[in-house]
């Protein structure tokens, strides 16, 4: 997918950068959601009514007022209705800028991050900063559903093709949760691989799992950000399968101390953040 937009030309992705020695909110860089939504025809009216980009930030550190380093892990929920998503490398550089800066306590850091991220995204952002004790007991979790990956099929094309979903439903009405660990796309700017687990929960006509798997695999050489891929999958399923209810949720592997987990639904509440085996 080729995008031509001035907002992408200024991004730090793919460029040599220096790490800031002191806290700097100006390091954050926005990417307009309209960049992808215009092409999908959903800039004004999205088919999903609930959603967030759920980030886990593992590399957070700052100094307390006595100069002693502090560490934490953050859960960050960026509302789908925000004007912008946040470019991941700029997010990493921003978080690194806290390393040698003094803050009074956890709450001061959390409030600072929430303010800065909300301003960059031009929308609602929730930040929960967790001390290490919270994550010491966190288990490796999984997304519930039937895995569609173990099918004995031959794949010869890895170019994105939404037409794999054409005529993908039967007349049987079901409620299903389907999982694939084979979602792989590429960064829009750097072409680096993005590896994810895809979760689909729907109510409606039964979706043919072979067609769905071929569609998922077709993302393998596709270039878009994580958030854009999930919105594309949601729109394609609504167009071809026309379910009564739909949730699309992807959890991507960690890069640069961050994992990004976009969630879009027209009927389910936002999930609690969790951690999969590959995260």
UniProtKB/Swiss-Prot annotation:
Where does the record say this protein resides? Cytoplasm
Q: Which organism is it from?
A: Haemophilus influenzae (strain ATCC 51907 / DSM 11121 / KW20 / Rd)
Give the binding site residues for NADPH.
88-89, 255-256
Question: Gene that codes for this?
Answer: queF
Q: Name one GO molecular function term.
A: preQ1 synthase activity
Please report the name of this protein according to its UniProt entry.
NADPH-dependent 7-cyano-7-deazaguanine reductase
Record: active site: 187 (thioimide intermediate), 194 (proton donor)
Q: Which NCBIfam families match?
A: QueF
Q: Report the HAMAP family cross-referenced here.
A: QueF_type2 (MF_00817)
Name the UniProt key words of this record, in alphabetical order: Cytoplasm, NADP, Oxidoreductase, Queuosine biosynthesis
Q: What is its EC number?
A: 1.7.1.13
Q: Which GO terms describe its biological process?
A: queuosine biosynthetic process; tRNA modification
Q: Which reaction does it catalyse?
A: 7-aminomethyl-7-carbaguanine + 2 NADP(+) = 7-cyano-7-deazaguanine + 2 NADPH + 3 H(+)
Annotated positions binding substrate: 86-88, 226-227
The reply on keyword DNA damage is no
Enzyme class, one word? oxidoreductase
Known partners and oligomeric status: Homodimer.
The family classification in the record reads: Belongs to the GTP cyclohydrolase I family. QueF type 2 subfamily.
């Amino acid at each position: 997918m080729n995008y031509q937009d001035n907002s992408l030309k200024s991004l730090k992705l793919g460029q040599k950068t220096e790490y800031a020695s002191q806290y700097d909110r100006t390091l954050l860089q926005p990417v307009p959601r309209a960049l992808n939504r215009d092409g999908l025809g959903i800039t004004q009216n999205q088919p999903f009514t609930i959603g967030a980009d759920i980030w886990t930030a593992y590399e957070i550190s700052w100094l307390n007022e006595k100069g002693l380093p502090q560490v934490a892990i953050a859960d960050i929920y960026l509302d789908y209705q925000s004007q912008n998503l946040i470019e991941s490398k700029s997010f990493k550089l921003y978080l690194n800028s806290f390393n040698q800066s003094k803050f009074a306590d956890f709450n001061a850091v959390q409030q600072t991050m929430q303010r800065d991220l909300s301003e960059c995204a031009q929308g609602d952002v929730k930040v929960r900063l967790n001390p290490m004790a919270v994550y010491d007991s966190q288990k490796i979790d999984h997304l519930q559903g039937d895995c569609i990956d173990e099918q004995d099929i031959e794949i010869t094309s890895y170019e994105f093709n939404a037409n794999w979903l054409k005529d993908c439903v039967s007349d049987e009405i079901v409620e299903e949760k389907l999982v694939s660990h084979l979602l792989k796309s590429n960064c829009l700017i750097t072409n680096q691989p993005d590896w994810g687990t895809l979760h689909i929960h729907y109510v409606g006509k039964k979706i043919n799992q072979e067609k769905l798997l071929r569609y998922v695999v077709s993302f393998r050489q596709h270039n878009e950000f994580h958030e854009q891929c999930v919105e594309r999958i949601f729109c394609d399923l609504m167009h071809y399968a026309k379910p009564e209810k739909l949730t699309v949720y992807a959890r991507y592997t960690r890069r640069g101390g961050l994992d990004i987990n976009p969630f879009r639904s027209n009927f389910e509440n936002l999930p609690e953040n969790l951690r999969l085996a590959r995260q």
